Swiss-Prot record:
Domain RH1: 10-100
SUPFAM superfamilies documented for this protein: RILP dimerisation region
InterPro entries named in the record: DZIP_RILPL, RH1, RH2, RILP_dimer
Identification of the protein by name: Rab-interacting lysosomal protein
The entry's keywords: Coiled coil, Cytoplasmic vesicle, Endosome, Lysosome, Membrane, Phosphoprotein, Protein transport, Transport
A single cellular component GO annotation: late endosome membrane
Protein source organism: Mus musculus
Gene3D superfamilies: 1.20.58.1770, 6.10.230.10
Subunit structure, as described in the record: Homodimer. Interacts with RAB7A. Interacts with RAB34. Identified in a complex with MREG and DCTN1; interacts directly with MREG. Interacts with CLN3. Interacts with FLCN; the interaction is direct and promotes association between RILP and RAB34.
Pfam families the record matches: RH1, RILP
Cited function: Rab effector playing a role in late endocytic transport to degradative compartments. Involved in the regulation of lysosomal morphology and distribution. Induces recruitment of dynein-dynactin motor complexes to Rab7A-containing late endosome and lysosome compartments. Promotes centripetal migration of phagosomes and the fusion of phagosomes with the late endosomes and lysosomes.
Biased composition (Polar residues): 337-361
Length: 369
């Protein structure tokens, strides 16, 4: 390869080169002087006297040499390229950061909008549930009022029915007595027709004495219109009872088939209806109210126990695992205890019978008209 030809230098370049050459000469002169001094110290006091100082002096002189001579043209070009690459990288990073800074508020606004929509929807659902619960509570109150009204009407019906039965029984007795009296009078008339004419003069006295009770029986009996009125009232009361029973059964079906009714409220309503049925039955039959059995009490809380089993358990602490030497025996014992109640609860679940469905309140059988 041919040696590069030196390009003509400008005056400024020449002056700078002269200054650089003089600075380099000064550095070299300083290095020679320091070298001779250090060698003299080493000859006088031994080589170990300046062993720690020599590397530092050499490093400082090399730095002064580089600064005095200046970088080569190739190194300047490489450093300029590196600076351009670094500048381009910094510009790209700055642009990316600006884009992220501009897109950050938009994403936050979108997230806030979504959160607001979710909260509004949940608020609407809660309001709908509250309205539904209020409506259900109003329906249960109306059902309780209808039950009370049914009890009152049932008691009035029982009193009226007892009065009608006594009246009908008395009327039947009077009708029977009247029929007996009519049969006796007809029999006496036949006997009088068969007897001779001589005995006819004595018979009217006896006939007047015997049928003398007929007008009293006739006066004490009910007329046909009164009996019709009594039977009509009884039929109307039976119709009212039937309508109330149908309405009560409708409300019971609505409450039992609705899946949105909470299980606790439904179970409480079942227990209340069972109590009302026992009260109505005791009032209708005139017997003392039956005491609640243990099966009913256990069945009423069966739903609560199932709900508690569905609740997730609190996770146990794992700190004791780090002290396994001391807590190993205690952790094995609860595991055995938890496995045993699980099997016992399964056996109890298989043995518990299913609860019967509720039926509408029974009414007393009315006598046939």
């Amino acid at each position: 390869m041919e040696p590069r030809r030196a390009a003509p230098r400008l005056p400024s370049q020449a002056s700078s080169s002269v200054g650089a050459g003089s600075a380099a000469e000064l550095v070299y002169h300083l290095a020679g002087a320091l070298g001779t001094e250090l060698q003299g110290l080493a000859r006088r006091f031994g080589p170990d006297a300046a062993a720690g100082l020599v590397p530092l002096v050499v490093r400082a002189l090399e730095l002064l040499e580089k600064a005095a001579v200046g970088p080569a043209p190739d190194s300047l070009q490489v450093s300029a390229q590196q600076a351009e690459v670094e500048l381009r990288r910094l510009r790209e990073e700055n642009q990316r950061l600006r884009q992220e800074l501009g897109s950050g508020p938009q994403e936050e606004r979108a997230l806030l909008r979504q959160l607001k929509e979710v909260t509004d929807r949940q608020r609407d659902e809660l309001r709908a549930h509250n309205r539904d619960l209020q409506r259900r509570s109003q329906e249960t109150e109306a059902l309780q009022e209808q039950l009370q009204r049914l009890l009152l009407i049932n008691s009035e019906l029982r009193h009226k029915l007892a009065a009608v039965q006594t009246q009908l029984r008395a009327a039947q007795d009077r009708e029977r007595e009247r029929q007996i009296a009519q049969d006796g009078s007809s029999q006496l008339a036949k006997e009088q027709s068969l007897e001779p004419d001589a005995a006819t003069s004595d018979d009217p006295v006896d006939t007047q004495k015997q049928p003398g009770n007929l007008p009293e029986a006739v006066q004490c009996g009910f007329s046909r219109e009164e009996l019709k009125q009594i039977l009509q009232e009884r039929n109307e009361l039976k119709a009212n009872v039937f309508l109330l029973k149908e309405e009560l059964a409708y409300f019971q079906r609505e409450l039992l088939t609705d899946h949105r009714v909470p299980g606790l409220l439904l179970e409480a309503m079942k227990v209340a209806v069972k109590k009302q049925r026992r009260k109505i039955k005791a009032k209708m039959l005139g017997t003392p109210e039956e005491a609640e059995s243990s099966e009913d009490e256990d069945g009423s809380w069966l739903l609560l126990s199932n709900d508690k089993e569905d609740v997730p358990l609190v996770p146990e602490s794992r700190i004791q695992n780090f002290f396994g030497l001391w807590y190993r025996g205690e952790t094995e014992a609860p595991e055995a205890e938890t496995s045993n109640p699980a099997s016992s609860s399964l056996q109890k679940g298989e043995e518990t019978p299913q609860q019967p469905h509720l039926q509408p309140v029974n009414s007393p059988p009315a006598p046939n008209s």
